[in-house]
């Protein structure tokens, strides 16, 4: 009795609702669609009658037959459903490939009729859904899981049609009921149906807003842990649509721990599913440092690199490369990507047919390369990069030269590999073709500077620059309008080229000496201008003291050549070199003492050095803790004292012996060798200056890219000498 008095079972309620609303099948119960597919064009134009074309030798009889059947033909063409089945209609169509005028006129009427029928059915769908919404909402909130399941199936069918879908998304109560049902049910079929409903609604902006307002995002994020693949697909696709088009969705997904659930999905094997997942990661991490760190903490770099290494589905590779590009500007993610083999995995896709994938990989490699200077196994990548130097695309050249510059910095193996791969010739041709493109020229010159020093093939590289007619082009880069970062790189390269005796004459013939002296004088004047040191230190990110040091160091090496020594001294440079001995920077003191050491080999220059009062600062420098400074100072003092009276020479000898050589008698002989070897400080590995130039400490020497540019690429990104972190792009 209590059972009869209580609430009816769920199945009974569904049956009662069906009977109260519909006397006939509405299409919901059976799943029949309201509008039949008319893909084959037969629904409204199928001919259940036969056209016959009769040929006779009597024209009058033919004309009579056609006149009698004219109305019948028009009616059959315009309203084919009015013709009785089995009727025979005479046709005037002679050529089956050409329509008659009546047939042509009938087409618009049939199209209009079809449109009217579709419109009627559309309106029927909308009205049906509108009437059903209140009751369906109630059923979705029912405690009986069977009722909820049946209601979810019905709503899922309704959301597959545009009219009913629009009606449903305009009901906040309905959408909220779907979200609650998805969260609360333990039935997988109900979960799949409700996830499908939200997926269908997410194709319109109104649906996205309804899902967002109803708290659908946290529910969808929880569905990312579902064991059912179809639920996973519906959830990730719906979230993807929300991230793309719904304002506030990104923050909501982050707050719901969406990233923590998405990153493990990278282990799935469906390429299309992975493409959507990686695009979600890109949308969430772009411009958000916290999201990048969450991806790192959940093993994202390893999963992303594995995708680049394993799959060949272009869209997946492209979306994955976009995520890596965003992560590659994060100082924490950068080494993780490199350690996971990211450089090699990205390098695999530099020779494919997809231009957008290649560009993404190049930008990412460019961002990562300063953290990969110690990586092994770069041979294939380096060869590909050298090959890309022949490209005409400015973005490819910018990236390829930048990566080569970083990977050859303080890495003997990479320097040798690039040199043996004809990298020097390719870089010179790149410089010649780049003209005024300074964002290409600077890294190309930096790469050449690295290749021409401190590795077994350095002398080969120095000779290759000359043999491929690179010296005149390189010296020209000292002129304006090239920016200071380019000038600084060129000065360092000239110094390295001068280490090869065969390059001394070509450098002199290219007017390298007067250009270096002019540049040195200008930089020294700029460095001495009144004002705070912070204000005068940098121009385009380059300290003028670094230019002073670089020019003096280059002149030091060029002064090894007797003819060059005379040219340098004749340009009234000795007073400036003596003045540089008072510099507060040890690097400047060292190169100044070094060039004076070479110039002092000529008697006339030695007399000028002494007359300029160099003895006092040189005596002071004998006590320097920098071995190079002390050694050069001793050599200059010894050479300038050779023509002095015996008492002076004795005093100098005693001072030198006491201050510099009391612990190493043999060093005295080394101090006055005819040619002093340049002393390389630790900071001069592949550059010069307090921080070294070539290492690209925390990023490459390039301006940040426009943060709004996610997929497009632009060229005008001038380098400067400051190591900096990239913004997202």
UniProtKB/Swiss-Prot annotation:
ARM repeats lie at residues 121-160, 161-204, 205-244, 247-286, 287-330, 331-370, 372-409, 412-453, 459-499, 501-539, 562-601, 603-649. The keyword Zinc-finger does not apply. Disruption phenotype: Reduced expansion of Kupffer's vesicle lumen expansion and decrease of CDH1 at cell-cell contacts in embryo Kupffer vesicle lumen cells. Failure of Kupffer's vesicle lumen expansion, however this has no effect on the asymmetric Kupffer vesicle cell volume changes between 2 somite stage and 8 somite stage. Initial tooth development continues as normal, the tooth enamel organ differentiates and ameloblasts produce a normal amount of tooth matrix. Morpholino knockdown shows an increase in expression of dharma/bozozok and ndr1/sqt expression in the majority of embryos at the sphere stage (4 hpf). Its main location: other. It comes from the Eukaryota. Belongs to the beta-catenin family. GO terms for molecular function: alpha-catenin binding; cadherin binding; nuclear receptor binding; protein phosphatase binding; transcription coactivator activity. Common junctional plaque protein. Required for Kupffer's vesicle lumen fluid retention and expansion during embryogenesis via maintenance of cell-cell adhesion junction integrity. Plays an important role in cell-cell adhesion via maintenance of desmosome and adherens junctions in the heart and is thereby required for heart and vasculature development, potentially via regulation of the Wnt signaling pathway. This is Junction plakoglobin a. Abundantly expressed in the successional lamina and in the epithelial enamel organ throughout cytodifferentiation (at protein level). Expressed by differentiating osteoblasts, dental papilla cells, the reduced enamel organ following tooth attachment and eruption (at protein level). Expressed in the epithelial crypt surrounding the functional tooth throughout all stages of tooth development (at protein level). Expressed at intercalated disks in the heart (at protein level). Expressed in the skin (at protein level). Expressed in granuloma macrophages (at protein level). Expressed in the ovary. InterPro entries: ARM-like, ARM-type_fold, Armadillo, Beta-catenin. Interacts with ctnna1 and cdh2. Interacts with cdh1 during early stages of oogenesis, interaction is no longer present when oocyte develops into the unfertilized egg. SUPFAM superfamilies: ARM repeat. Pfam families: Arm. It is found in: Cell junction, Desmosome; Cell membrane; Cytoplasm; Cell junction. Keywords: Cell adhesion, Cell junction, Cell membrane, Cytoplasm, Cytoskeleton, Membrane, Nucleus, Repeat. Residues 23-43 are annotated as: Disordered. The keyword Transferase does not apply. It is a peripheral membrane protein. GO terms for biological process: adherens junction maintenance; atrioventricular valve morphogenesis; canonical Wnt signaling pathway; cell adhesion; cell-cell adhesion; desmosome maintenance; heart development; Kupffer's vesicle development. GO terms for cellular component: adherens junction; catenin complex; cell-cell junction; cytoplasm; cytoskeleton; desmosome; intercalated disc; nucleus.
